[in-house]
Amino acid sequence: MKTVFTSILVLAAIIVNGQVKDAKATALLDEVSAKTKTYKTIKADFTYTMENKQAKINESKSGVLLVSGDKYKLTAAGQTVICDGKTVWTVLKESNEVQVNNLDNKDDAMTPSKLLTSYNQNYKATIVRDKGNTDPNAESIELIPNVQKNFIKAILTVDKVKKQVKGFKLFDKSGNIFTYKVTKFQTDVPSTASDFTFDAAKYPGVEVIDMR
């Protein structure tokens, strides 16, 4: 689960920090950014696959991400990560425990709310052809970090008509390839503050591990 969540936040960091040299890529990301800022909430259902040919690993799972401002709730792989903008609760279903941490705003540990909000010079991006992409409305952007990161590159796929992220591939230094595909994208979904806070009453007998 840590890998899943880290990869999603890396995607956020890529888009946030993606100062690009390709004019076409710049324009497209600017348009997606502007569109994203108009949403009060975003709910995305997604599937993800981790592949490592050398280690003969090929695992697939699914999840749901709900975002509202600095707050988010991610459910995937038997775990739920909840953040109210300051505190992060990681609920482990199998062991019936919740780990409590302060939100880390350093480096790539960024909140999904920072998606598409500003740019700097941490990435070089270029429009590329993705052989696996058959959607005529989709555009693929290769992003290579200019500073040291725990991944080599990412390929972001964007719907150039709807101005929405369709998915991305993340290639790390261990030979792992993480592929994420958005299967359902909803905007301005009704939500309340309780969606982004941990309620122990919903998890009878849960063990609380405060790591702050």
Label the model's feature ranges.
Residues M50-N52, V67-K71, V147, K160-K162:
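Beta-strand elements of well-folded, non-transmembrane domains
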Residues Q54-K56, G78-Q79, G175:
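Solvent-exposed loop/turn segments connecting transmembrane beta-strands
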Residues S62-M110, F178-T179:
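An acidic-aromatic
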Residues V20-T41, D45-M50, K56-N58, T87, ...:
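Flexible, processing/modification-adjacent segments and terminal tails
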Residues A125-V128, T134-P204, I209-M211:
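Gly/Pro-enriched, hydrophobic low-complexity segments
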Residues M1-K21:
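Bacterial Sec-dependent N-terminal signal peptides
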Residues S60, G69, A76, F151-K153, ...:
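Short beta-strand-initiation
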